[in-house]
Each structure stands twice: as structure tokens, then as C-alpha cells.
């Protein structure tokens, strides 16, 4: 997140991994099979057999409300007075879509709903599509539209519109029921592109008690009127990521899951109103390490993104990290989390603003209503350590998540 502001579970992780698999190649939750029409039959006739449908519709919903309380701007604050129309002190909860909370309760910044469809042409070929609407943008957005072809028991190809797998929770980032927070840590999960149009090759296998998943992917993405840059700049900003190339590898052994990812892309950012036309080379590295011991679990993730604008301009690094631990007490899951984000530039005199640093501590309490829905309450304490982002704030949020 380069900032002219003066700026990633289900009740058990095993269920979470099942959801990952479902999102990768099927729908979230299969709809009930359609029953064959019953023809009149003699009393001794066998009951008609069920005929599974090739078409499935599923969905997810997160109604999230929150507000800032006890917010303040330090005396040496040099950041903006407003972010995306919201007066600061404020809290940026969703960088990718421009979701910002203020001192009045609002459902707009993060609430969203999605519908996913899947059509199976054959046992080896299907199509998956997903449309999402948000409080910040009520226009339906196609986030997935890809064909999945299974080459054999271990290899499959996806071609079309997909999620950039930059983070551990990227494939199901919009499915609030899939994780313990109200929303994934914005210190990591929030950049100017989250999807891409292209192709990926995916491999899965098991070796004894070890499970392996790997993929390579490539493509491009264009975002008109970027929600991310509404936070940073006035007016309309368009974004293009071209020549996206990346790979990820995930290993699971018992309670331990480790994932590594690499991505690179050429990017351009244009805003005619500000005479802005920037080109950069982006590189990203990430590692996630998770532990799940049934009654308690630990989630951690570290990423570093770099943007190089050329030798006559500047380049900067933006490492971000999160670590959290939770305890499962039947239907209740308390979860504590810490996250941090920082920037550093190789030529500070040319960097548009003072590099930003901020950190956040949060406490979440989740209650599982049933196997398809939950409610969560989360309190965040956000510190703007360089006094140039949004101020120091406390935030309270509540959410209702459902899959159907």
C-alpha cells in the first residue's frame, strides 16, 4: 500500500481446508440434488432414483457494521483530514474497496454478498462464476468466471477470471464464515488488484501424512476507478497489472500448514485529474505458518511487496505481518491478533510522502449459530505511529456471516 496518505476459521482448520478445496474447484456448499420427476408406479415398484443436477448455486453474506470511538489526531499529524469522504480520525478497514469507518455507526464500509454458480459439463470440465456486491459499490462485480479442467487425479487447469492467490485467505477472502476475524487484516489484505484474467496450473497430492498443493499462474488485470486509490487520491484513478506471473506452494502435516508465494507484475496507475501516470515493477513474497491443535490454533502471515519506479524516481518496500491465536470453546471462539505495516524508500527525497507505519491489536469473539452462520464482535486498537495515515483510533465492529 503506497500511500499518498501520508500511507490477511471455521470451527476447525480441517473444515477450513475443505472449504479451500471447494472454492478452488467447486462451489462453497453444493445445493441439494434435484429429484427426478416421479411417474405413476404400481405399489410394488421401486422408488425413483435421484438424478444429480449439473448446475449448482451457492452464496455467502456478511453484514458488518462498526464505528470509531476514542479517536484522535496527534498534534504532529500530517495526514489527510478526510479519506474517501470520511472525516479523520478514521479507520481504513478495506483498502481494496475503499471501506473507511468514522465516528458514526455504518454498515457501508465492509458489508457484502455474493452468489456463486457452477455448471458441470462432464466429470472433468466445469465452469465457476461468482458475482459480489458491496456496501461501497452496489454494482455487481464479477470476481470469478473461469473454466476448470481436470487433467488427472493430481493436475487441473483453470482459465478465466480468478482471484490472485497472494495471501493464504485470498481464495475465500470474501467469505466471512471462513475465518475468525470480522475481516482479514487490512495491513496485508488490501492492494489495488485482487483478481486477474488468465490461467493457472494446479497440483495436489498426498505423500503419507503430508499433503501438497502447488500452482503457477499468469495473466493481467485492469481496474477502472480503483477503490484502493479513492483512499489515496482525489478523482478517478485507473490501475493496470500486466504480465502477472506467480507461484505458490502449500504443505500440510498434521496440525502444521506452511504456505509460500511469489508474484511479479508490471503496473501502471493513471489519474488524469492529477496528471498522474506512474509505471512500476511490482514483486511480492509471502509466507504463512498456521498451527491447529483442535481446541486452540495459531494463524500467522508475513508478506513483503516492493515497487520499483525506475532509477530516476524511487523504489520502496512494504513489509506487513500478522499473528493471532484462538481458543475453541464449543460454539465460542475468542481470538486475539496483532498486525503491523511499514514502508521504506530508497530515495526518501523523491518519495511522495513520509513513509507510513502503523500497527493494530484486535480482540474478536465469534459465536457459531449453526453450521452455516456466525456472529462476531471485534474491537481494534489502531496506532498511526508516523502520524500520517488516519490517526489513532479504537474501532468496534459486529458482523453476521452466512453461507448458503
Label each PLM-derived region with a short phrase.
Residues 85-89, 153-156, 191-330:
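Signature for the C-terminal beta-barrel architecture of outer-membrane proteins
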Residues 53, 103, 107-113, 139-143, ...:
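Residues that define the transmembrane beta-barrel architecture of outer-membrane proteins
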Residues 92-96, 122-127, 134, 175-183, ...:
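Flexible, solvent-exposed coil segments and beta strand-coil junctions
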Residues 56, 62-66, 102-223, 250-254, ...:
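Outer membrane beta-barrel
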Residues 2-7, 13-83, 90, 399, ...:
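N-terminal periplasmic/intermembrane-space "pro-region" immediately following the signal or transit peptide
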Residues 50-53, 66-111, 229-239:
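Surface-exposed strand-loop-strand hairpins of Gram-negative outer-membrane beta-barrel proteins
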Residues 100-106, 172-175, 185-191, 229, ...:
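Extracellular/periplasm-exposed beta-strand and loop segments of Gram-negative cell-envelope proteins
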Residues 4, 34-36, 101, 148-150, ...:
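Outer-membrane beta-barrel pore domains
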Amino acid at each position: 500500500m503506497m500511500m499518498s496518505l501520508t500511507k490477511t476459521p471455521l470451527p476447525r482448520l480441517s473444515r477450513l481446508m475443505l472449504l479451500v478445496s471447494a472454492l478452488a474447484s467447486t462451489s462453497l456448499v453444493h445445493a441439494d440434488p434435484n429429484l427426478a420427476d416421479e411417474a405413476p408406479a404400481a405399489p410394488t415398484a421401486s422408488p425413483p432414483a435421484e438424478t444429480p443436477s449439473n448446475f449448482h448455486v451457492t452464496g455467502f453474506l456478511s453484514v458488518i457494521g462498526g464505528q470509531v470511538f476514542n479517536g484522535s489526531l496527534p498534534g504532529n499529524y500530517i495526514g489527510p483530514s478526510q479519506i474517501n469522504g470520511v472525516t479523520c480520525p478514521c479507520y481504513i478497514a478495506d483498502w481494496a474497496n475503499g471501506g473507511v469507518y468514522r465516528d458514526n455507526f455504518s454498515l457501508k464500509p465492509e458489508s457484502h454478498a455474493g452468489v456463486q454458480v457452477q455448471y458441470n459439463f462432464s466429470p472433468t470440465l466445469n465452469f465457476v462464476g461468482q458475482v459480489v456486491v458491496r456496501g461501497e459499490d452496489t454494482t455487481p462485480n464479477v470476481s470469478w468466471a473461469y473454466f476448470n479442467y481436470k487433467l488427472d487425479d493430481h493436475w487441473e487447469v483453470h482459465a478465466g477470471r480468478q482471484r490472485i492467490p497472494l495471501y493464504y485467505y485470498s481464495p475465500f477472502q470474501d467469505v466471512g464464515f471462513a475465518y475468525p476475524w470480522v475481516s482479514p487484516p487490512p495491513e496485508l489484505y488490501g492492494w489495488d488488484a485482487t483478481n486477474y484474467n488468465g490461467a493457472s496450473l494446479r497440483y495436489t497430492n498426498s505423500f503419507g501424512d503430508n499433503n501438497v498443493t502447488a500452482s503457477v499462474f499468469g495473466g493481467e488485470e485492469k481496474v477502472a476507478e480503483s477503490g484502493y486509490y479513492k483512499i489515496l487520491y482525489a478523482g478517478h484513478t485507473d490501475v493496470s497489472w500486466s504480465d502477472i506471473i506467480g507461484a505458490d506452494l502449500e504443505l500440510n502435516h498434521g496440525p502444521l500448514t506452511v504456505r509460500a508465494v511469489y508474484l511479479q507484475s508490471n503496473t501502471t496507475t493513471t489519474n488524469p485529474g492529477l496528471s498522474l501516470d506512474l509505471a512500476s515493477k511490482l514483486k511480492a513474497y509471502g509466507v504463512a505458518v498456521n498451527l491447529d491443535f483442535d481446541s486452540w490454533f495459531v494463524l500467522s502471515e508475513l508478506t513483503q511487496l516492493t515497487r520499483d519506479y525506475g532509477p530516476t524516481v524511487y523504489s520502496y518496500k512494504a513489509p506487513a505481518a500478522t499473528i493471532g491465536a484462538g481458543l475453541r470453546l464449543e460454539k465460542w471462539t475468542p481470538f486475539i491478533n496483532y498486525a503491523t505495516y511499514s514502508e521504506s524508500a530508497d530515495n526518501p527525497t523523491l518519495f511522495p510522502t513520509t513513509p507510513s507505519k502503523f500497527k493494530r491489536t484486535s480482540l474478536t469473539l465469534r459465536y457459531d449459530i449453526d453450521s452455516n452462520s456466525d456472529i462476531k464482535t471485534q474491537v481494534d486498537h489502531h496506532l498511526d505511529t508516523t502520524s500520517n495515515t488516519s490517526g489513532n483510533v479504537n474501532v468496534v465492529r459486529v458482523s453476521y456471516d452466512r453461507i448458503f
